[in-house]
């Protein structure tokens, strides 16, 4: 990297002239800052600031945690129609169908990262809702949407901070994309300025936080009562008997009033339920927080991987009790049948997008332990 305020390196200028996105990287040695403390200083309350953390097995910190902010593009989809904002908060409808629009944005955002950077150092970050499946499968009319949220939102951050718990360093990556219309000098200077601003924010003292208090949990409510849920079960069994379906998830939303700080909610969640996939996503007018033990899918170097989890027991209070619960879980016919069904569904899903004869089960019916539960995984 050239000194701040200097011209861009030759590789940056050459790649930019060829129309390829570029990154500017800065490494900070830091073994005191945590991803949570950093987010409180650089992302708290910022629209489209994201935090992704990992606690492997519910006990050991994963190697990487990520903060993203300052997207130059935000893509969203609702009811099959896509819109794009170029960082100014104003969304314009895309001329093509949603999948064509998304493919175009992905192609414009693809870049070659320098050696030594993890793959999540730049690109698109966001969420897909379940209703995005309607772009691929004919499912009939959509259900009512009481939350009135987009079906998907993807952001293209120009600043990504990667916390490496092995090297005890923070890697700052500022991405620049030629579709923004800047020349190489201006794009490089803007990337340097973003790194400077982030580093300044990071070096500030932590903001004062409200004193922690013990508060009663809010009451959760569901739009479905017990009788209504029983009716749903009966209808599902009828569909199965008729051959229309062979598995259904009877999900329904539990809601509670929350007037506190959304990030405080996330901090409580990560303490109570540490997991390999923790996230806090601030979209401005709504936030998402979650803690999950499993990936939905991963695509890396042309290989698709899924890891279905199904079958659960609570953790035992002693090692002996824990092993007994594991044996009980693996011997339970219902749990094994459910897991086998998910395994078959997973093979089918992967097979739809893979070369014939290349799908294989690498490992099956292994028990993974987390802070409060254990799961069967394949």
What are these model-derived regions, one by one?
Residues 1-378:
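Extended alpha-helical targeting/anchoring segments
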